[in-house]
């Protein structure tokens, strides 16, 4: 039996709270069960040097975990003087995922940075970050439309993400920490609302997985992402 008696295809309870902080152009507290991430969007009228004069914008992301977001305290990466490889990998994943939902030409020469700060971790922090940051990004862009900065909406569609895996021989979606740490196969899937996939990250931690198991996991991920899209749309009032 899974934690909280969930079915194998059942994500954790998803809660998305918009306008969580007052200064950022977009701010969201996203909760996947006991995993909680604060996602904020910052708009700047400048682009990275490699994009200057090209008439297009940029979307990037940063990711971090608070010291006591986990069972025992982690040292802040700022105190270490450098980011870890896991952090850099995750924030690049978040940024790639969010750029897929935006027409960068229509955004114009401005940059939007999504900061994803994990308040409490219980598995799936990167997928929760993508899900919450997508809503914060929508809010930031809606603000640009409302104040007349943008004439057309550059959002091409929502993006969501979920973890799937094989635990005790069973394919399951949205793994909690106790499941993730025991998974024979662990996979993260990022999808557009139209069903196209942005990223699939899968690893066999023990026995290799079969082609049939891969297809089963992808189907579970699609089901889970579709439920997340519903939560995102409800949060945005769409």
From Swiss-Prot:
Q: What class of enzyme is it?
A: transferase
Q: Which GO terms describe its molecular function?
A: 3'-5'-RNA exonuclease activity; RNA binding; tRNA binding; tRNA nucleotidyltransferase activity
* This protein's record includes keyword tRNA-binding: yes
What reaction does this catalyse?
A: tRNA(n+1) + phosphate = tRNA(n) + a ribonucleoside 5'-diphosphate
Pfam families assigned: RNase_PH, RNase_PH_C
Q: Is Flavoprotein one of the keywords UniProt gives this record?
A: no
Keywords, A to Z, come to: Nucleotidyltransferase, RNA-binding, rRNA processing, Transferase, tRNA processing, tRNA-binding
What's its EC?
2.7.7.56
GO BP field: rRNA catabolic process; rRNA processing; tRNA processing
Quaternary organization: Homohexameric ring arranged as a trimer of dimers.
Tell me the protein's name: Ribonuclease PH
* Protein species of origin: Haemophilus influenzae (strain ATCC 51907 / DSM 11121 / KW20 / Rd)
